[in-house]
Amino acid sequence: MTDEKQVSDSLNRQTAGNPYSAADPALSAEDNQHWLSFVALLQNAITQDLHLPLLQLMLTPDERTALGTRVRIIEELMRGELSQRELKSQLGAGIATITRGSNSLKTAPPQLKSWLEAQLLANKR
């Protein structure tokens, strides 16, 4: 079995019946397939404890920093104690980045919001 076929089969197994695996409307069909291939690769890397070196290979230091900042933005927005302007000052992020995070959070599925709350806020209150 070719590597491409293995990834395709893995994606099909992982996304079957999953309502969150639908095509990303922001991506072309081809780009969505590439995205899902990356997600499958990352999932496999996690099971083999290779996720950190994979992410270091795939993301520049600036991209890794940006992801960390986005996690902090979502965390603080969920906590709800700071205004977007205060977040901008505290995190050094642009107001547009914070607004995008806020808008994305508003449209996130309830199950994801609950999971994020448990992951990001449970031990930090």
UniProtKB/Swiss-Prot annotation:
Q: Any one cellular component term from GO for this entry?
A: cytoplasm
Q: Please note every region of biased composition (Polar residues).
A: 8-18
DNA-binding region (UniProt annotation): 84-107
Q: A GO molecular function for this record?
A: DNA-binding transcription factor activity
Question: Could you list the residue ranges that cross the membrane?
Answer: none
Q: Which UniProt keywords apply?
A: Cytoplasm, DNA-binding, Repressor, Transcription, Transcription regulation
**Principal subcellular localisation of the protein:** cytoplasm
Q: Which NCBIfam families match?
A: TrpR
PANTHER family of this UniProt entry? TRP OPERON REPRESSOR
Q: Which family does it belong to?
A: Belongs to the TrpR family.
The job of this chain, per UniProt, is described as: This protein is an aporepressor. When complexed with L-tryptophan it binds the operator region of the trp operon (5'-ACTAGT-'3') and prevents the initiation of transcription. The complex also regulates trp repressor biosynthesis by binding to its regulatory region.
The name on file for this protein is: Trp operon repressor
Q: Which gene encodes it?
A: trpR
